[in-house]
From Swiss-Prot:
Annotated spans, Disordered: 25-57, 203-287
Subunit relationships: Part of the 50S ribosomal subunit. Forms a bridge to the 30S subunit in the 70S ribosome.
Domain of life assignment: Bacteria
Purpose: One of the primary rRNA binding proteins. Required for association of the 30S and 50S subunits to form the 70S ribosome, for tRNA binding and peptide bond formation. It has been suggested to have peptidyltransferase activity; this is somewhat controversial. Makes several contacts with the 16S rRNA in the 70S ribosome.
Organism: Nostoc punctiforme (strain ATCC 29133 / PCC 73102)
Keyword terms, alphabetized: Ribonucleoprotein, Ribosomal protein, RNA-binding, rRNA-binding
An example Gene Ontology molecular-function term: transferase activity
Record-linked SMART domains: Ribosomal_L2, Ribosomal_L2_C
Protein name: Large ribosomal subunit protein uL2
Listed Gene3D superfamilies: 2.30.30.30, Nucleic acid-binding proteins (2.40.50.140), Ribosomal protein L2, domain 3 (4.10.950.10)
Basic residues bias locations: 209-220, 259-287
NCBIfam families with a match to the protein in the record: rplB_bact
Gene Ontology CC annotations of this record: large ribosomal subunit
Length: 287
């Protein structure tokens, strides 16, 4: 897997980088493992916009991914590595010995023809799924469960991996990609290795159109809106926001203000909060 760039024969191709798709071995999805996808366009069940700047984009078939890895002690052969339009990571098609087919997230370095397995007695190899209690310290894992049997919920993005740093009692301590250190129950499953397509973070859209293909609409700055639409709006010309700090369209402090509920029950499992990420836009004022 790598990236490919173009000669600057148009302004957009000067900046664009795309994946070379070298690891893809099959172009058409397994029909029995696909389903239609409801496109909410950022709306909730009442039709109100709850996630701004969503809509349009290319129609996509959803690939049914096995995040649970609950088919224990049955070997599976990696039959193909495929592109998935619903995520940055690639997916691997598995053929189990009993005839069943499933998709999983493609671990980095996993080749077609490799035999993988899940279960508490599985060998310690990339792509195998084991309980956290059976995974050695210092190991990189992905697709980590937060509740036993619920399926992997965290560390699923392209190139992501968490590290097992400690074990004590009923819990295993993981260092997540965000920098957060968190306790997870020892009987939760995780997959050995790092998620593939590690170069996804290095890709550049190059033009607005590629973002529109993905259903991402333009982001309008609050300072160019009217006062009825945003607290930063209004004024003559390029006016300052008129506040001590930037706020959301609903008046809540943003760009650094903590939003996590202090009474959230899962807070007791967080050993160290994630590191601060810079989300400031142009001039550090917009939301």
């Amino acid at each position: 897997m790598g990236t490919r760039s173009y000669r600057p024969y148009t302004p957009s191709t000067r900046q664009v980088t795309v994946s070379d798709f070298a690891e893809i071995t099959k172009t058409e999805p397994e029909k029995s493992l696909t389903t239609s996808k409801h496109r909410a366009k950022g709306r909730n069940n009442t039709g109100r916009i709850t996630s701004r700047r969503r809509g349009g984009g290319h129609k996509q078939l959803y690939r049914i991914i096995d995040f649970k890895r609950d088919k224990h002690n049955i070997p599976a052969k990696v039959a193909a590595i495929e592109y998935d339009p619903n995520r940055n990571a690639r997916i691997a098609l598995l053929y189990y010995q009993d005839g069943e087919k499933r998709y999983i997230l493609h671990p980095n370095g996993l080749k077609v023809g490799t035999i993988i397995i899940s279960g508490p007695e599985s060998p310690f190899e990339d792509g195998n799924a084991l309980p956290l209690s059976r995974i050695p310290l210092g190991t990189s894992v992905h697709n980590v469960e937060m509740t036993p049997g619920k399926g992997g919920q965290i560390v699923r993005a392209a190139g992501a991996s968490a590290q097992v740093v400690a074990k004590e009692g009923d819990y295993v301590t993981l260092k997540l990609p965000s920098g957060e250190v968190r306790l997870i129950r020892r009987d939760c499953y995780a997959t050995i290795g790092q998620v593939g397509n590690t170069d996804a973070r290095n890709l550049s859209a190059g033009k607005a159109g590629r973002n529109r293909w993905k259903g991402r609409r333009p982001k309008v700055r609050g300072s160019v809106m009217n006062p009825v639409d945003h607290p930063h709006g209004g004024g003559e010309g390029r006016a300052p926001i008129g506040r001590s700090g930037p706020v959301t369209p609903w008046g809540k402090p943003t760009l650094g203000a903590k939003t996590r509920n202090r009474k959230k029950l899962s807070s007791k499992f967080i050993v160290r909060r994630r590191r601060k990420s810079s989300k400031r836009g142009r001039g550090g004022r917009e939301s």
